[in-house]
């Protein structure tokens, strides 16, 4: 947990259609001192991202209506969010090479579920370049 209570925490946006994933990831990151916003759809996530301009985004690849890859393309087209660090998290171990290559070309990390506490916190630190404070 952060030892700087007066320093604003870094904001992470979690986008996943599985409420148990968003709840678990949110709780785990909040315990580490991050501010967390959560969305249950890509459309809701895009709205939150534009409103709150998170420091990093962790999102699911497979979501109904708008996929994580479509979300990533949209984020990269928004000037204020173009350089936001993004990680796509998926349980799809047989991801097609073209999709994996596009994710990499769009500057996002690709990780596989399940993510345990240490892995999730490590991912957040990696995306944000360090501790959960500015």
Q: Where are the predicted features?
A:
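Hydrophobic/aromatic residues positioned on beta-strands within the core alpha/beta folds
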Residues: 89-91
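Active-site residues of response regulator receiver
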Residues: 60
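Conserved acidic segment of CheY-like receiver
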Residues: 8-20, 25-29, 57
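Non-catalytic signal-transmission and effector/linker regions of two-component phosphorelay proteins
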Residues: 1-11, 116-134
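Alpha4 helix (beta4-alpha4-beta5 surface) of REC/receiver domains from two-component response regulators
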Residues: 70, 93-112, 118, 122
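Two-component/phosphorelay signaling modules centered on CheY-like receiver
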Residues: 19-37, 105-108
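Helix N-cap/capping motif at the beta->alpha junctions
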Residues: 38-47, 68
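Receiver (REC) domain active-site loop signature in two-component systems and cognate sites
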Residues: 63
